[in-house]
Amino acid sequence: VNSGVLAYSEDASTPAELTIQGGKVETSANGANGVFAYGSSTINLENATVTTTGEGGSGGIMVAGGGTLYAKDCNVTTEGGSSAAIRSDRGSGLMVVDGGTYIANGSKGTGPPAIYCVADITVSNATMQAGNAQALCFEGRNPAHIYNSYLEGNYTASDDDENCNVMVYQSMSGDAAEGTSYCTM
């Protein structure tokens, strides 16, 4: 698993827990996430700056495989294609974000959303922007809860696709459970 910071445990009887207060996390490799909670792990991230510049899924803060991540007052910026600022993937998880700025600046065509939702994600009191993509993308049966926040997307179709700022889809890769996604704002 390629990340600047990773908390990982496969065994619920020996969970991993990591707390980071302040500091900077920077990654530049393709596919390198900034801060990633996987499996039976929990990350508490507060007042930190996270920057990723690699292509191909270099998310800012991420959960997968059932991981849990709490982010408070962080500044997260991603520059690569398919690199959401708030990212989740196969196996779901829980992410709770309170305050801060989360910006995804990937290039047009592969631009990442501000939030890529394959987990239970709650965001409050935050600013989220996608420079060249939908603001929010749901894959499969997953909820997003957004309160007292600013969420902006900038997706414009390059072919016959519809212009939209929220995308909901079900991939056939098995990354996400089938069912209904929903968003509360």
What are these regions (language model features)?
Residues 33:
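A well-structured
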